Amino acid sequence: MAGWDELQEGSAPEEQEYGPISRTDMVRYQGASGDFNPIHHDEEFAKSAGYPSVFSVGMLQAGILAGFATDWLGAANVRRYAVQFREQVWPGDVVVCSGTVTRKYDEDGEHKVDVDLLCTRQASGGAAIKGAATFVVP
């Protein structure tokens, strides 16, 4: 976990790859989250809705990105986490998570950093999720 003295604006951890995301991963996440929309597990349903195949629940990637961020800066230190869903993740995709410190400051007696986060699809380079978070840093 990165500490206050190690971090500067522009600091970034090593990118991390996750996957390939399998249909089993997708169904497991659906079971854990209670989101059973058939577009994420029923091939015929997804195709009838105009998609080439089933695709991952966006919150799966949001969880992967959150795990990346908390591995970097500590789960107990999260003060804010927000994401925007940009692009579907398909079975077999590998996603790559990255982050950058955008602001380092003191507020309310605590050291804090704001970070931009990104989860991209390795195959296309497209952003699956863009995120932002605030962490307290000891």
Labelled PLM ranges:
Residues 71-97:
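Mid-chain, well-packed structural core segment of small domains
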Residues 1-77:
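Hot-dog-fold acyl-thioester-processing enzymes
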Residues 39-44, 79-81, 108-109, 121-126:
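Glycine-rich loops and low-complexity Gly/Arg-rich segments
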